[in-house]
Amino acid sequence: MPTGLDSWRKLMDRIHEIIVVEGRHDTQRLKKYFDCETIETGGSSIDDKVIEQIRHAASRRGVIVFTDPDTPGNQIRHIINQHVPNCKNAFVDKHNARTEKKVGIEHADKDTLWNALQNVVTITNAPKGSLVTYLNLV
């Protein structure tokens, strides 16, 4: 017999792809609102093991790169997109993901996160600088 938590999980929005985030607070925030799996990069010095984990996830279910709307987040996104082609990318505006002192997806509300996940883009064979140009437009 299902418990109350099981019923709640069925009502939560299920994300098929595995979401790549920077850290555990991002994971906690996403799992608060969505039924999803994440891979945490642990910061901007992404090691080969994490890249391989992302490659494996991309081949199984696909991945969505969802990093913070700041310089380190953009650097992480760039590294992942260079090493793992055809990733989907979710973006939030930094004004919708901040506190007084910090910027990060862990500070965004459910609607902001959901809108970002519904409007993912895939960057393919992008010339250098095009991701930065795109980020300046959003």
Predicted regions and their residues:
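A short, flexible N-terminal coil/short beta segment enriched in small residues
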Residues: 2-18
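Aromatic-enriched hydrophobic runs in primary sequence
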Residues: 8-9, 28, 138
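TOPRIM fold recognition
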Residues: 13, 32-37, 44-138
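Conserved beta-strand elements of the Class I
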Residues: 18-20, 64
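Short alpha-helix boundary/capping motifs
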Residues: 20-21, 70
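Short, polar loop motifs at secondary-structure junctions
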Residues: 23-27
